[in-house]
């Protein structure tokens, strides 16, 4: 039987017996209060006479604390096993944490066995049905079996040589960097004492606050998480003192550690930034929300499903380790719901040109007339181009076609070791230059307007500077989407690039011929570990839920490799040495000078971009020699760019040409609701307003090779 709340707020007791285990169970803090008052009917179970009120209470063998009298302890018809956490909590403290006002009063009526069992399930100590013991036993066996599959997937990849063996270098880098912070404090006794004293005082305040709360006071939190922190959204993180204490202790310690890093002012800025980044990885991993025993929602789910959720989760983990060839490749979306050319990248078009490095797609017109000047889009090769053509509602490509543009998009190959020697020069020659020649053959037009996105924008800037040196004027105007040409303040990715780390990356690329796409994907995920790693760890492997189908996350997981020569050049000459903006970069023996690029430029930055920070883009825009329209979009690196004109989520800011301080530009900028796409198309039309009859793919000198989105985009890592 179980304790049920009566309408008067007092507890009714079913049957006594097996006092110790049930009393402990009743004392465990409840994750959710059922809030239901139950009725107990008389049945065929003989009543138990209550003991005298003068009876001495029993004491716990472990704690010596008094427990409720035997007649106050409920005994179900089939006594359930108490949850594992029950035995770890002393009854008086646990009862206080659970908020029990007083021991239950005895009752003279008893419930029938069936109803009593249901009552016990409805009022489990953790606010969820108690697990079915038989189902739990089966699931434990299945859990062990699925765990074996995870181990088998892990080991088989290593035996076959597919897996990357060991992560000693990465771990060593983390330990070395954080060790320098520790040395900073250990080298000064006063500094170390102040740091320890600060944390001790905060914990004393937390203990005091918790005790006052257990005494019935309403007290504000000592350390509250940010309101936007979804990890602690479940009400029990605040309502239950036990979990509230764990949460606050975590938040407090995390902020204390982060402050230690920030105050280590004798470290060089790069080391301090790296330490902060690595600390963020550690604290994100150790969040109590990531563990079954310290997450109230996970405990409820596990009890309600008798552990079935953990079996499903481990099954998914085995699949993800196998898919990652011995590495855990956490799925962020259900990729089975999306198919290229069916419900992703569906804008009609044809591949009209192909070489070793790229396919060129020409999209079919949707207007009777088009601007005479075609548009060439140069996407990043770190990801795939269809982020600009996710679906009809979000597609920048489809929208640009509808505005009367003849759109061409480069789809980069997903390279293997055969393309290891393809460097920046090759991507310029066989990428942008080859595309310009193909566009002229397809349309008869020599003048082109171009867009470069992210590293595709950096390549476009390099190409424009090279074209200025050789007198090539085929690109008449250019747009940059979240692209950097100055890397002095290049954002979070710069944390991965210093002399030592670059040497390690170059060694790995020399062995394979490329940088594995999973390595780059992991780097991007580590920039937002709570959102892109640990939320899926909890959802997939602990809750046992398939992630929600989301096209953007499917694209995000569709990683690509980078040729060794190309990536080495990019990291060394851009991130490490910042050669492009400083005039030190050479291509084919020619020094590049961005000030010689005189064509009109539309420079788009995203306000919350952590990959190409808005300030960095602003600084880079000042190096060009022609007119520059700098526009600041709301949101980040992807959502700031893909902000559809028909259904905009964010705003944008416009102002004077980029000069002076970024903060001054922002203060004076004009905010406009809606999508920057509308502003951009007006700018494009102003650069070349002439129109011609619409051009169909294949109508020129180049015949179609395949339907869009082509073949190269389908090659996966």
Predicted regions and their residues:
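Alpha/beta-hydrolase active-site loop
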Residues: 421-442
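Short beta-strand/loop motif that positions the catalytic acidic residue
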Residues: 603-605
